[in-house]
Swiss-Prot record:
ATP binds at residues 23-28. The lineage of its organism: Bacteria, Pseudomonadati, Pseudomonadota, Betaproteobacteria, Burkholderiales. It comes from the Bacteria. It comes from Burkholderia pseudomallei (strain K96243). In the N-terminal section; belongs to the bacterial glucokinase family. This is Bifunctional protein glk. PROSITE patterns: HTH_LACI_1, HTH_RPIR, SIS.
Length: 641
């Protein structure tokens, strides 16, 4: 973190896309900062969470106070598990959608990660001046590191070395069940059970846990204490020498040592255990003299093992900013450094060769890519201060057919910012929110399909379809829509095809199939027993089955080739939406594959196709090429006179 006047070197190292917003949001306070360049963290401000109705309100207040205009990228470390788009804080009343927050604040990128995952990413960069070793032990290089820290809650994480980088673990280990080690801790557990049905380590060795320990010990000694005594009061009394407060702190540190030892043996953390959070630093010498280290090593047969593992207290100021900055930098680097983002690199390479007007469109695409993707051409032209034809010329200068083609390529380069987890629709969502969630969920599912689809199976399926004597498409209920769409596409190849959505018709037709025939069975569940029996009959007669279904289903296991389309629906009881889209996409992939095969057929197939097309007065290759163009979102094939 830097202070003082900005040097020329610092100015040169500023982020090209502007300052980045960093946040560390806890149960009590929200801390914000700006990173103007790598390691240049400034304008740190702290806001009490209770004073703001929402996280968005707190961020807007910070941006206003910091007098910052546009921020493109932001990353938030939050004291809460982060699983999907919706975040509901455990130790505060804030609840928000990550994507809705990003849109409301106008960010291009908004990352939200667990605070201890962020803190973990800061550990490799800490210097000796930013940590204090507690007890003995020596850390082993390139070994697992453990992290814990009592604050409003008890955060837990870890770092695993992987080649030249570190992988941070997301964990809620603080909620592991508390296990007492002596009679005094038995008493604390019994007291806590009166209030909580499940007593986790977080209940007794997070900040509020010290109050529980203090009150449990007071009850043991039959001492009356004020109702408003909190952890800060207890720590202050302990520093002043109050016997009961000192015992509470001692007990607290011992329990913390037990938990740290558990974490060390669980992770095999030979790289050391680090202690963060806001409570322990306030204990000062009370912690250094406490039984923490002795309890850390007290693991019976593993005492020698733990004696060699060092424990450190983090003393760096605002270390979570360092970690969340590293995570954001890696995310943005992945976006711009991968093969999928070649369009960004091409824009940068071509920029100087563009006209001044086209250059303004290029700058808009680089700095605000979502604006290009989401806005109509009239808004893009207005924001870039150019004419609409200039926008089209810019796209063609990059080798794109037009604006739509450029938007598609640009979106591919932005996959790192598209949510890859499912966003739940909730009662009370506005049309903007639930509409965006439906679209995001669909896009996310398609991207995941692209990442996990077995393309060897796709090639096998295309070969089977291309050589089929007859193709029948079977789908029940909602899947019948997909079957009908497939029939509409494939009958144009000159192969006899039909689609059935009725079990009786499927059974009757399947009984007539044999070698050379193919059934494409479309099913979300892949478990309908009647459909499975129909397919068994056809396969026993020599027909082949291509299944478009979920993985590890009876249908996937029975099929000649399975094309697996796993996904998450919002509710099992409602009409399948995402699965239908994925199944339609699979049909498009298969149809394009067959069209490509038939656009350049071998001699034997060409002769067969020519005979099939003779009555239509079209050559096989021309017809297949027309269909390929149509499937590729070009013009529909012209009707033959």
């Amino acid at each position: 973190m830097s202070t003082g006047a900005q040097t020329k070197a610092a100015a040169a190292s500023q982020h090209a896309d502007g300052p980045r917003l960093l946040a560390d949001v806890g149960g009590t306070n929200a801390r914000f900062a700006l990173e103007t360049g790598p390691g240049e963290i400034t304008q740190i401000r702290v806001y009490p969470g209770a004073e703001y109705p929402t996280l968005t309100d707190a961020i807007r207040k910070y941006l206003k106070d910091a007098k910052i205009g546009r921020v493109n990228h932001a990353a938030i470390a939050i004291a809460n598990p982060v699983d999907g788009d919706q975040v509901r804080m455990t130790n505060h009343n804030w609840s928000f959608s990550i994507e809705a927050t990003r849109r409301a604040l106008g960010f291009d990128t908004l990352l939200v990660v667990n605070d201890f995952t962020a803190l973990a990413m800061a550990l490799p960069g800490l210097t000796d001046a930013q940590r204090v070793q507690i007890g003995g032990g020596a850390r082993r290089q390139n070994s697992v590191i453990g992290l814990m820290g009592p604050g409003t809650g008890l955060g837990v994480s870890g770092l695993i070395p992987a080649d030249d980088r570190w992988i941070a673990l997301g964990s809620e280990g603080g909620h592991a069940t508390f296990a007492p080690m002596d009679e005094r801790e038995d008493l604390v557990l019994q007291y806590a059970r009166r209030k909580y049905p499940h007593v986790s380590f977080e209940r007794v060795c997070a900040g509020p846990g010290m109050e529980i320990i203090y009150r449990a010990l007071a009850a043991r000694d039959k001492k009356r204490i004020a109702a408003n005594v909190d952890t800060a009061d207890i720590v202050e009394r302990a520093h002043a020498g109050d016997a009961l407060a000192l015992e509470a702190v001692e007990c607290f540190c011992a329990i913390l040592g037990t938990f740290a030892g558990n974490l060390a043996v669980t992770l095999g953390a030979l790289g050391g255990i680090y202690i963060g959070g806001g409570v322990v630093p306030k204990l000062g010498e009370l912690f250094m003299r406490s039984p923490f280290r002795a309890r850390f090593e007290a693991k019976g047969r593993f005492e020698a093992y733990l004696a060699n593992i060092p424990t450190y207290l983090i003393t760096a100021e605002y270390p979570a900013f360092l970690g969340v900055s590293a995570i954001l930098a890696e995310q943005l680097s992945n976006r711009t450094g991968g093969a999928s983002s070649a369009v960004f690199e091409r824009i940068r390479q071509m920029r100087d060769a563009l006209t001044p007007a086209e250059r303004r469109v290029a700058d808009l695409a680089l700095n605000h890519p979502r604006s290009i993707i989401n806005d109509p051409i009239v808004d893009i032209a207005r924001k870039a201060d150019v004419s609409q034809p200039t926008v089209i010329r810019f796209c063609r200068s990059l080798g794109c057919q037009g604006l739509s083609d450029f938007k598609l390529k640009l979106a591919t380069g932005l996959t790192g910012t598209i949510p890859m987890s499912h966003s739940q629709v909730h009662l009370g969502d506005t049309a903007t929110d639930f509409g965006a969630k439906v679209l995001d969920n669909t896009v996310s599912a398609i991207l995941q399909l692209r990442e996990h689809l077995n393309f060897e199976h796709v090639e096998q399926a295309i070969d089977i379809l291309n050589n089929a004597r007859r193709i029948e498409f079977y789908g029940l209920g909602n899947s019948n829509i997909v079957a009908q769409d497939a029939h509409y596409k494939f009958f144009r190849f000159g192969i006899p095809t039909i689609a059935y959505g009725d079990l009786y018709m499927q059974a009757a037709s399947a009984a007539l199939l044999g070698k050379g025939d193919v059934i494409v069975a479309v099913s979300k569940s892949g478990r309908a027993p009647e459909l499975l029996r129909v397919l068994d009959v056809a396969m026993q007669a020599g027909a082949k089955v291509i299944a478009i279904t979920s993985s590890n289903t009876p249908l996937a296991k029975r099929a000649t080739v399975a094309l697996e389309t796993d996904h998450i629906e919002m509710r099992e009881s409602q009409l399948s939406m995402i699965s239908r889209i994925l199944h339609l996409v699979m049909i498009d992939i298969l149809a394009v594959g067959v069209a490509i095969r038939r656009a350049a057929p071998n001699a034997e197939l060409a002769e067969a196709m020519a005979r099939a097309k003779a009555r239509a007065g079209a050559s096989a290759g021309d017809e297949a090429a027309d269909v390929l163009d149509w499937l590729s979102h070009g013009a529909a094939p012209a009707a033959k006179d």
